[in-house]
Swiss-Prot record:
Subcellular location: Cell membrane
Originating species: Mus musculus
Protein origin, superkingdom: Eukaryota
Phenotype when the gene is knocked out: No visible phenotype. Deficient-mice have normal numbers of mast cells in all tissues analyzed. Wild-type and deficient mice develop marked local inflammation when sensitized with a high dose of DNP-specific IgE, however deficient mice have significantly reduced IgE-dependent passive cutaneous anaphylaxis (PCA) reactions when lower sensitizing dose is used. Deficient-mice show normal recruitment of circulating DC into the lung, but a defective trafficking of antigen-loaded lung DC to mediastinal lymph nodes.
Protein name per the record: C-C chemokine receptor-like 2
Extracellular side: 1-42, 95-109, 163-202, 265-285
Other comment: It was initially reported that CCRL2 responds functionally to CCL2, CCL5, CCL7, and CCL8 via intracellular calcium mobilization and transwell chemotaxis although no evidence for a direct ligand-receptor interaction was provided in this report. These results are now controversial and other studies failed to confirm CCRL2 recognition and transwell chemotaxis of these chemokines or a series of other CC- and CXC-chemokines using CCRL2-transfected cells.
Tissue: Expressed in macrophages, astrocytes, in glial cells. Constitutively expressed by mast cells. Detected in bronchial epithelium in OVA-induced airway inflammation. Up-regulated during dendritic cell (DC) maturation.
């Protein structure tokens, strides 16, 4: 009495995941999604908001207070603008994660091009800062004589031209990834790998590692070694707090894990890592390290501002004059002791809300 019909064998297939993983190659294993769409939305919005605030504040302080009469400030301004360019695609990727609506293919290419151009311009800005810092230290006043502001502007223009040219493969050949039968331009896929051809994958991965990690690391090591040879012990202690060295060092630390995992993922066939388990863990590691690397654009301006805390607080007090009228209330009667004679300059207050004692 049962009314049913038997479907032909070729009408449907039953997919068993274990059989799929056992019988499929490493390129066919579904990539893991480390973050849910809601988490991608929160991450992109948070990084964009913090990075926008930090970099706009850095640009404002550089233009209004510090001025652009020396090369260091010009290069720091170029670095902040590069960070903003790197941040621009994040709101669009957040919208894609929230609503599932991807922008057009042309818009995706532009966003990916901006993202890559901003990253490469940051690398060149860090290198310019390192080289200029070394020249000022080694040549003294001669560096400012032979290197003018116009030369710095030309160097920044050339840096942007090179960054744009190097990002052309990402923007021209970019193809949004396929998700649920739809092409999706979203955060997560390495955007410098626009196509899946093995040769292009190797070439673009090598380009990314050389430009973002190997080249700036080499310049960083050379500059540090040359500075150490020319410095006394006291000067070395101060040198560790120079913004150019600190910012570049933190940049390399945040991008080194991503580039390392990326190298293993791209060349896994040649490193005996092509099994399903290794591929899965490599894909997950790429996503995790990409999150860490993306947040560097929020850290750079904070380091630049906080390494010179006294000047930064002075600029903030000039921006918000009412903060100067807030009386300081000591919680435990802790007061600043007067400086002793013959022991150098007194320590300046870097905040009207906090005081500390000069300990000799």
């Amino acid at each position: 009495m049962d009314n049913y019909t038997v479907a032909p064998d070729d009408e449907y297939d039953v997919l068993i995941l274990d059989d799929y993983l056992d019988n499929s190659g490493p390129d066919q294993v579904p990539a893991p999604e480390f973050l849910s769409p809601q988490q991608v939305l929160q991450f992109c919005c948070a990084v964009f908001a913090v990075g926008l605030l930090d970099n706009v504040l850095a640009v404002f302080i550089l233009v209004k207070y510090k001025g652009l009469k020396n090369l260091g400030n010009i290069y720091f301004l170029n670095l902040a603008l590069s960070n903003l360019c790197f941040l621009l695609p994040l709101p669009f990727w957040a919208h894609t994660a929230a609503h599932g609506e991807s922008p057009g293919n042309g818009t995706c290419k532009v966003l990916v091009g901006l993202h890559s151009s901003g990253l490469y311009s940051e690398v060149f800005s860090n290198i310019l800062l390192l080289v200029q810092g070394y020249r000022v230290f080694s040549q003294g006043r001669l560096a400012s004589i032979f290197t003018t502001v116009s030369c710095g502007i030309v160097a920044c223009i050339l840096a942007w031209a090179m960054a744009t040219a190097l990002s052309l493969p990402e923007s021209v050949f970019y193809e949004p990834r396929m998700e649920r039968q739809k092409h999706k331009c979203a955060f997560g896929k390495p955007h410098f790998l626009p196509i899946e051809a093995p040769l292009w994958k190797y070439v673009l991965t090598s380009k990314m590692i050389i430009l973002v990690l190997a080249f700036p690391l080499l310049v960083f090591i050379i500059c540090c070694r040359q500075l150490r040879r020319r410095q006394s012990f006291r000067e070395r202690q101060y040198d560790l707090h120079k913004p150019a060295l600190v910012i570049t060092g933190v940049f390399l630390l945040m991008w080194a894990p991503y580039n390392t995992v990326l190298f293993l993922s791209a060349f896994q066939e040649h490193l005996s890592l092509q099994d399903e388990k290794s591929s899965y863990h490599l894909d997950a590691s790429v996503q995790v390290t990409q999150l860490v690397a993306t947040t560097h654009c929020c850290v750079n301006p904070l380091l630049y501002l906080l390494l010179d805390r006294k000047a930064f607080m002075r600029y903030l007090r000039s921006l918000f004059p009412r903060c100067n009228d807030i009386p300081y209330q000591s919680s435990g009667g802790y007061q600043q002791a007067p400086p002793r004679e013959g022991h150098g300059r007194p320590i300046e207050l870097y905040s009207n809300l906090h005081q500390r004692q000069d300990i000799i």
